[in-house]
């Protein structure tokens, strides 16, 4: 923190206590991202589905709120059978918009051994040895667009405002961000792309970097954010919904981020489409590498390349060989 960084703790929360949280705050912790989902096989929560786990999420959110001044985020890995629970998780987050700052849904991905072979240079690799290749479900190709469709069944006006595209597939949404404004009782609207551009550009001009995590006090300034409605039509609509009841101006309006992350996609020609400009890069052996693929770095020292199993047939069909 003394170096101008924002120390964020990514954790399952099992060992966190109010006493430890207080010590970490004194040490400079900026925020917590709790990874909680029904596939973790948690002691005491093994039978709970995503909706049931909202009770556990609330425990951690209240703990951080009681300590004060610490950003509160939740991650959940989304599988085919848990996709339907996202609207209920967002309902819970809406109900606690005053203490929950960010909800992140990470779509599950697994090593694809059905359609591609893996190579390190000329050597074929058995990727079954890596830990993230266990118990692969039927679907490992859910897209961010599908998640949005599911959310809109409950929140028809749900509207993302910013994204990162794929490194190999520019029209894919790898990080898809939405920002909603509301109270515990009602969501009034969403931030538009113009407002997000203004915020990020202004922050970059002032500090030379882009805005990510914010203190909880900033998430309570939803009314101030409505001023950007002069330039952003989504916030303008939000403003008019909000002032229909003039007495609302005496209540706090909260901002809450919702992020959908779509990890690596395997394209038909074997290319791997990663997140372009990935914010979760980590330093390994003096280089920036994808943190979600550290197992390959640890075991092989490189990210492994993929080629279609029927590559020879494809090349012959195209008269390349």
Locate the predicted segments by residue.
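A structural signal for short, well-ordered beta-strand segments and their strand-loop junctions
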Residues: 73, 102-105, 162-163, 282, ...
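Flexible glycine/acidic-rich beta-alpha junction loops that bind and position SAM and/or redox cofactors
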Residues: 42-45, 81, 100-146, 162-182
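Soluble, non-transmembrane catalytic domains of enzymes that act on hydrophobic metabolites at membranes
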Residues: 154-158, 162
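Amphipathic alpha-helical segments that form well-ordered structural scaffolds
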Residues: 59-63, 146-153
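Short secondary-structure transition/capping segments
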Residues: 23-29, 59-64, 115-130, 166, ...
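Radical SAM enzyme core and accessory elements
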Residues: 164-165, 172-321
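A structural signal for well-ordered alpha-helical scaffolds and beta->alpha junctions
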Residues: 57, 86, 140-148
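Radical SAM/AdoMet-radical enzyme domain recognition
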Residues: 1-107
